[in-house]
């Protein structure tokens, strides 16, 4: 059986029926990976991994007004915490397994919930748990404010070139991925602490993030390639690192555009698989290149060409043919294409910034805490057109 989600979205792009089919496959995948809790997949582990769950929660918030599964996943993360100070990689589970990177994504998932659904009284109760995780990470900071080699499994993506999903790292750490993920999480936590928690903790997190930012460019920037390397010795480069450099604002403006273009064009980089495309596509939008989004859906087109009716865990050879972490188009068709996004906690402000690419006509509706948001765009041959927005009252 599956959790009784009700899809409250609409989407139409005349002449581009492939996009509607992608949404159908994604929603089917998301539904099959949720019953009592979210699951990574319905056949193999059937476990709620918090790295997967961040994406699953965003799919839920963009496609349904039901908050239960999202809030339950966040709470299960808290219930999984151990005395060491981090969450388990997945929960509920009778086996203690730790993916230290997933504890960071768990905090980011809480920030997502705060931004899109609010629930500030509940979120305030989570802040002590977030402090534990961030304090656990703080112990691994070196004097130069770069992380040493973070223990446990630091899974990032099943990318060819990573060792069992872990990024390229040196024995001393010096890992851009570790540092950028920690910076992102610190700044999300600082926003929550400033608004609903302890401003002194917000200041503390911002101080660490600021000092860490000072190490990123000297250690990892390669001006000859217009890219950030994965390690200080520059022995590896990945799309993952450069996507996070854009998302954290380490690179901005024209430089970020160059970095994004190089990240997409240079095939020698370690490539994101379907999971981390969530972050790559967000970086595409953040760099100002969101109009290229439709051109970067090949990994999903390839799976459709194989006849799959759910999204696989990773490109062939894959094990699981149904993995919800690949259903991020069910977020980004609304957030990137239609440009509907939250601009304040609880979705109290709505930002509209479409990236239509080659589309001449597209429309859609998503649920909102106060009702729904609809966007309708039509362009003529000269690229001129109209936009109609229907916003909820209040």
Regions found by a protein language model. Name each.
Residues 207, 214, 291-394:
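Non-catalytic C-terminal accessory modules of carbohydrate-active enzymes
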Residues 55-66, 106-122, 181-199, 243-253, ...:
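Well-ordered alpha-helical scaffold segments within catalytic/enzyme domains
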Residues 85-86, 270-274, 304-311:
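Boundary/linker segments of alpha-helical solenoid repeat arrays
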Residues 82, 118, 142, 194, ...:
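Hydrophobic alpha-helix feature that most strongly marks membrane-spanning transmembrane helices
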Residues 2-25, 31, 38-87, 116-178, ...:
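Active-site acid/base region of carbohydrate-active enzymes
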Residues 255-264, 294-297:
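Alpha-helical repeat scaffolds
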Residues 37-50, 91-103, 164-181, 224-242, ...:
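Solvent-exposed loop and edge beta-strand segments that line ligand/cofactor-binding
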Residues 19, 49, 70, 99-106, ...:
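Active-site-proximal structural scaffolding
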